[in-house]
Amino acid sequence: MNCEQRRLCPFGLVLEAHFPGQDVRDLNVEELRGLLRQEQLLVLRGFKTFTSAEDLSHYCEQWGEIGLWPFGKVLERVERDNPEDHIFDNNYVPLHWDGMYRPQVPEYQIFHCLSAPASGQGGRTTFANTELALKNASPELRELWQSVTGTYER
């Protein structure tokens, strides 16, 4: 893979561009899929990316069929003052899964940040690895979790 690789803890991998202007589309999607299956999370930093939502959706189609939402293929999330939906404000959103209202679980979710914080400053999105949580939980905790059910309502 023509980029720098750095492990995240406790899971995931950061892929950083080798040079300014390196285009994310030049990375082999099959190799990225393999890394994603192995690492569960890929963060790509410093790459030239997309000029429009349509450009992003064309790239995502290389990964597989795109699930359609009421808003289309790409949610352009921009913080707003007094938004109608909490997802567009800049307040904390409790731990959730972005596909929680969908009947099918997508194989991949791709997020694209137009204005990311500097390296080392972190971001505002928390990613969790359920497999690791289950592996590291005590038998008592796993038993407790098995008794919990939930329903998403909007």
Label for each model-derived stretch:
Residues 1-154:
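Non-heme Fe(II) oxygenase catalytic core, chiefly the N-lobe of the double-stranded beta-helix
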